[in-house]
Amino acid sequence: MKHLLSLVCTLGAATLAASAAAEAGSMPSANGLDFVIDGEASYFAGSNAYWLSFLTNNADVDLALDHFAESGLKILRIWGFSDVTAEPSDNKVYFQLHQNGSSTVNTGPNGLERLDYIISGAEKRGIKLVIPLVNYWDDFGGMNAYISAYGGDKPGWYTNDKIQAAYHAYVKAVVSRYVDSPAIFAWELANEPRCSGCDTSIINQWATKTSSFIKSLDPNHMVAMGDEGMGLPGDSNYPYSYYEGNDFALNLAIPDIDFGTLHLYTTDWGVSNNSWGNKWVQDHAAVCKSAGKPCLFEEYGMKGNHCTYELAWQKTALATPGMAADLFWQFGENLSSGQTHNDKYTVYYGSNEWKCVVSDHVAAVAVRRYRLPVGGGQHGP
């Protein structure tokens, strides 16, 4: 029996390998409550590395992508934006300049050519990239960089015609550039879009229009909000409340939104009970299951004590129908210039924490992978 089981596993692995090779050029997609990558419908693990987009040393990019792929991680979320209001003098990477009432996309060596290199490298290694196209926050320019050039305020960003025209022009420049790349997992409308105190219709209408626009440019790839998952019924407390202008279920129902996204930062949100995060994951999964679309648990982390709490959240996500993948915040690396930015959430490759947050989790994902029915997001016996 032992030898038979070994033979079955070997043949199964060979079949999966052959299937993956045959489907390696296919585009990631959603199938029911599952994601499909390289022809395989399964649960996937990954991370975030915002800093990758701004590296200028190709060897550093290669090192990071190699370590990521070798670790068994599959989905990597990187920034697809870097908005400035004055052209940098130090060859700093930026993607768009907003100045004097106009916007210019930087397609040069310190612009979108940096994304070109990353995406090419991801293609070679079978890594799939989630790319948000603007930041709500001021880091790397954000929405306020548009406002500096065109006027207005944050709540008005979503409805300002001049701002939206510039944003759409940038979206078109980026999305059209990579329409045929199998490395793109999904385009995201923004990183953590909010509209504090606004009616939820503002973000919903903006997301409906923008997701349709992206699909018209690129029908090959998935589109998602990139939001934190705020706005759920049954609890009036933050972040379940609708204060930030988001309605998770309403936005998930948009036809051109392919999956739901959620983030989890108990400390930042003023939640003292970290086990609260398990319910946050389960409640979103229930909405995704009802909508028939998968959930991507795309950002989560703790400032220190990563193994204790993040492991619990990972186990909950892995065990909950409706959750299809998770990406911890964030992947850290030792580059030629030193360590990448340590925001206290960072888990560095090769560290002791890497084993529990990454290696052990990847192994658990592999166990589930062979028990997961296609399209159902359910468990085997």
UniProtKB/Swiss-Prot annotation:
It catalyses: Random hydrolysis of (1->4)-beta-D-mannosidic linkages in mannans, galactomannans and glucomannans. It is found in: Secreted. Its EC number is 3.2.1.78. Residues 1-22 form the signal peptide. Keywords: Carbohydrate metabolism, Glycoprotein, Glycosidase, Hydrolase, Secreted, Signal. Belongs to the glycosyl hydrolase 5 (cellulase A) family. This is Mannan endo-1,4-beta-mannosidase D. It comes from Emericella nidulans (strain FGSC A4 / ATCC 38163 / CBS 112.46 / NRRL 194 / M139) (Aspergillus nidulans). The lineage of its organism: Eukaryota, Fungi, Dikarya, Ascomycota, Pezizomycotina.
